Amino acid sequence: MSIIEDARHGIVTEEMKQVAKAEGVTEDFIRRSVAEGHIVIPVSPYRKVKICGIGEGLRTKVNASIGTSTDIVNIPEEIEKAKQAERAGADTLMELSTGGDFADIRRQIIANTTLSVGSVPLYQAFIEAVKKDGAVIHMKEDDLFRITAEQAKLGTNFMAIHTGINWETVKRLRNQGRHAGLVSRGGAFMTAWMLHNEKENPLYSEFDYLMEIMKEHEVTLSMGNGMRAGAIHDATDRAGIQELLINAELADKAHAKGIQVIVEGPGHVPIDEIATNVQLMKRVTNNKPFYMLGPIVTDIAPGYDDRVSAIGAAISSSLGADFICYVTPAEHLALPTPEEVYEGVISSRIAAHVGDMVKLKKVREADLEMGHARRDLDWERQFAVAMNPARARKIREERMPADTDGCTMCGDFCAIKIVNRYFKF
């Protein structure tokens, strides 16, 4: 039985127990939420991973995407990115290589992380078609499903599958137009394939077969967002909403079959439209775990998109998004370095925590502890509570004051020291 089927039969699995303990909730809450599809726990029969629950009532989780490109194929560096992401506190990884030996890269990444790993089988299928026949439009449907099964057998825990792109979605995209076109590689590949071959998306038309693969290998299905906006002026448009409606219907179908499902959301959304997107997605998907790709809230800050994304992610999380994909400072500019991966994860973890302070009041306890540590000028406690203790310690030690109780910001005029002479808080 799948983990959903166990939950439906009243069985609390070891994975459910681990999530309950980590999140400070009851085992029965986890079991019921998994059964209802409100929480997923990505697992695999092929490898043991650090168990992670994603969904309602749990801490917002952060994904870090890594992988080669056609210009840069450096497997040791990708392994280092995986390690940096895990050190920075990422909850999951997505391995999204588009250059090199896909199976070898994924195998090495999986061997060098304890985190759940996701993939996009569509990338490999289309890129192999380019290598073999010269263009993505020559991708064979059988190859797409074969690659999906092969990636599952490597121990992939969850997969982004672009099921929501069909003729209705493409028609709405064409009728409406866009300022920035399509920015999803999977969305662009599949749309081009459909238009050239005059055929329906096989991930949509053969969804029953896809579900067989997902079920057999216990892969969590992440409903891909191939029509997501690549500019804030394209946010919340008809093509994106059409894809969401299709994904929502297919997500219900997969859940009924005992397959865990996540639904992906948009990537570029102005702040005043975030609430609309989160509420709409949660409503039409029957409260399935919602995976927000950022979002980017302004398009004019390349080089700082980790911060731009953190603004959107904090708001999304506070409104109910369950899972956010990090963004690095290199977004829209280049393949990120390991250092940029680390920075991206930290930025997203801060955003997730800020959001969780709204929907999970208990996470504010860490902020309360930091407040007390600062009141007491207890630097070691401050470092221990900090999101990135090493960085906090480094900055202080590089600029250590003469009076080691305070810091070089205020020096002799430390407000806390002055008031502490008269008050005991």
UniProtKB/Swiss-Prot annotation:
Binds 1 [4Fe-4S] cluster per subunit. The cluster is coordinated with 3 cysteines and an exchangeable S-adenosyl-L-methionine. [4Fe-4S] cluster binds at C407, C410, C414. Substrate binds at M94, Y123, H162, S184, R185, G186, N225, G226, M227, R228, E264, Y291. It catalyses: 5-amino-1-(5-phospho-beta-D-ribosyl)imidazole + S-adenosyl-L-methionine = 4-amino-2-methyl-5-(phosphooxymethyl)pyrimidine + CO + 5'-deoxyadenosine + formate + L-methionine + 3 H(+). It is an enzyme of class 4 (lyase). The keyword ATP-binding does not apply. Its cofactor is [4Fe-4S] cluster. GO terms for biological process: thiamine biosynthetic process; thiamine diphosphate biosynthetic process. Disulfide bonds: none annotated. One of its GO terms (molecular function) is zinc ion binding. The keyword Lyase applies. Its EC number is 4.1.99.17. Zn(2+) binds at H268, H332. InterPro entries: ThiC, ThiC/Bza_core_dom, ThiC/BzaA/B. Keywords: 4Fe-4S, Iron, Iron-sulfur, Lyase, Metal-binding, S-adenosyl-L-methionine, Thiamine biosynthesis, Zinc. Catalyzes the synthesis of the hydroxymethylpyrimidine phosphate (HMP-P) moiety of thiamine from aminoimidazole ribotide (AIR) in a radical S-adenosyl-L-methionine (SAM)-dependent reaction. NCBIfam families: PRK13352.1, thiC. This is Phosphomethylpyrimidine synthase. It comes from Methanoregula boonei (strain DSM 21154 / JCM 14090 / 6A8).
